[in-house]
């Protein structure tokens, strides 16, 4: 049946209307188009994968590469050049996440108020410029200042990832995309490790005009700037503005997303959704889970090169020994991310991942043979699995744009707290074995297992309660009433487990 003239308006016009009147575009289109069959659904999903995911993956890779520069630099001369003594190096990682934590919540509101891809690209370019300028530092204080500023600029990126994935993919599709994004951290580690080793070899040949760690910052910074520019040009702020979709495809993408009963959200800030998030026990579970899994991450992300060197590997060999961890990370996270495509049991995956993490931590802490400890370091590449589960849960198990942004920011504060604490578990008085830090990894992973079980129990119980009540959205509700409903407000919403 042909549309009437009134119905046959363009998605572009509605996108503009949504932007001006703060209306939820997905709700406006919800009932305007036919049911999407499996073939069409696959086609739309594939097109999104081809046009949106690649640049998001590059952001993830370069972000990890940028954060890892301090780890590589720790054995490339930066501690000597900047006269670091005692526990001063610990504060390199802590200062980064201090800036990240303090500004994560206020800066994430920019994603709510302004175009998503434009804000994201601006911060990427800014952090790339700062990375490049880090080559100019000549004191410990100035280096700590740049790391703090870098943390501030990168605090926007993870909440942006959550929103990008939520506005382009359905709930059951989000876990793999989030896992694949984080898996690209592994490729970032491989690229950074390769560059570091190459610079180390050039240094041995006396072919460098400045310290290798300074050149490393220049290269990673310039790559990041270029990527930020491409984000600005290539990725649309929302599906209704996608230059790579036809008008009909834009309509269908929005219809496809609306089947989750979550819409694309309103750009209007809603205080009641923040209050609702504060009443949601999941937010606190996500927060403490982030702390538990981030403490080992914060420690090893900054000290793995030093610890590998202390196992007996020379500088160049220590840089190479970091690379298998990155390879395992990319392969394992990609494979683990595919499992929910068939079973949709992400909490089971989190528990399996944490069991492997616990094994990794135990090998690092208690194994005597060097090769067993090395195996523990390599298995650490699987450690982001619970982190992915948290991001995926926030993306798919919280509805309402303001609530989603707020819960993501609070979760990232927990992530920052853990990453701030992690480097501080490495005390110079315990060098070179750092046994206290290693034992803390084991304790944290045990705590994380109990929190994952609690999240699973909360979601299963609530789904059963809603199934028993068997309530539906009233047909008498106006479009205004249906806009930007939260998961608490929408009785048809079900939590993914």
Swiss-Prot record:
The chain crosses the membrane at residues 91-111, 119-139, 149-169, 179-199, 215-235, 283-303, 319-339, 347-367, 374-394, 406-426, 439-459. It comes from the Eukaryota. GO terms for cellular component: cell division site; cell tip; Golgi apparatus; membrane. Keywords: Golgi apparatus, Membrane, Transmembrane, Transmembrane helix, Transport. One of its GO terms (biological process) is transmembrane transport. PANTHER family: ALLANTOATE PERMEASE, PERMEASE-RELATED. Belongs to the major facilitator superfamily. Allantoate permease family. This is Uncharacterized transporter C1773.15. The lineage of its organism: Eukaryota, Fungi, Dikarya, Ascomycota, Taphrinomycotina.
